[in-house]
Amino acid sequence: MSPSAHPDAPIIIFGTANFGSPEDSKGKLFGPVTVEQGREYLDVLQEFNVDVLDTARIYSGGESEKLLGALDASREFKMCTKASGTLDGCGTRDAVLSAFKASSEALGVKEVDTYYLHTPDRTTSLEETMDTINELHKAGSFKTFGISNLRADEVQHLHTYARSKNYILPTIYQGTYNLLSRQCETKLLPLLRTLGIRFYAYSPLCCGLLINAEAKLQASTGRWDTSHFGGKFMNALYNKPSYIAASNAFQDMCGKYGVRPAGAAYRWVRYHSELEGGLGDGMVVGASSARQLEESLGEIEKGPLEEGLVGELEGLWDLVKEDAPAYSL
């Protein structure tokens, strides 16, 4: 049995942000760093019929793509990657072309299945960025165009321009969505439905906060390690009393119904959120070990949660929505 045992549910995409990741300041590894370790993950994915890998130029400083290339993963999986993001100028023609060239070389492929704009670059016009994306598509660099972390108005602007130029249109939007991050339901998702764009939900565990937020924040390891920029950024977004209270309430709810917290978080996104498998939506799942990946996929295949638990989970959003960061960057 596998996630494909629920054919009408959103698809599962495996996120490789931690592939090739360096140790944190306390010497803890986030994920696989050798071909042998990476192969263990891929074997689990094949066991569960998950065939889409998601990476990005900036993941682990480029080491994620490099490890996937060393694994020759594109021979067995659909490969999706993203242009460089987060920095001013990442959307210029030169930057986008350079990013794809680097990704192509690291992955060992000439074409990827899906190529994303990772983050908005508000110092560069969307027109220049889209001109370059279409140039890459015409050159046979990718099959499907995706976008991520854009505001709804930016999605509309980009789509309108691309359509006016008869360019490839974005057909996937990848954004954060979970029990504690539901801002996308108000404006973004309705727009995506209108434009025929699929939604892939990342961070279904809310960056792990749904799994004992207080302990994770106090430990200050991994993505919460405040010795680096990413950790400081994450703490600024989520290290708030409301999130700790919501996480504690979530643990209590899961205990009451006898379900694992991680499993409940994944299953809510896949079976009870506004994602629709019939429209091609998906959920991005990550893991810090092959064993954890196997456990997570096993939890997901259990299917929908009990109705009583789903009803209680709906109240979690009210605890954090006033403090919740925007769905876009």
Swiss-Prot record:
E.C. numbers: 1.1.1.-
Pathway(s): Mycotoxin biosynthesis
Keywords, ordered alphabetically: NADP, Oxidoreductase, Virulence
CDD domains, alphabetized: AKR_AKR7A1-5
Gene3D superfamilies, sorted: NADP-dependent oxidoreductase domain (3.20.20.100)
Active site: Y59
Binding site for NADP(+): 54, 148-149, 174, 203-213, 288-296
Broad class of enzyme this protein falls into: oxidoreductase
Marked site: Lowers pKa of active site Tyr: K82
Superkingdom to which the source organism belongs: Eukaryota
UniProt: substrate binding residues: H118
Molecular function GO labels: oxidoreductase activity
Entry similarity comment: Belongs to the aldo/keto reductase family. Aldo/keto reductase 2 subfamily.
Physiological role: Oxidoreductase; part of the gene cluster that mediates the biosynthesis of sirodesmin PL, an epipolythiodioxopiperazine (ETP) characterized by a disulfide bridged cyclic dipeptide and that acts as a phytotoxin which is involved in the blackleg didease of canola. SirD catalyzes the O-prenylation of L-tyrosine (L-Tyr) in the presence of dimethylallyl diphosphate (DMAPP) to yield 4-O-dimethylallyl-L-Tyr, and therefore represents probably the first pathway-specific enzyme in the biosynthesis of sirodesmin PL.
The protein, known as: Oxidoreductase sirO
Species annotation: Leptosphaeria maculans
Lineage: Eukaryota, Fungi, Dikarya, Ascomycota, Pezizomycotina
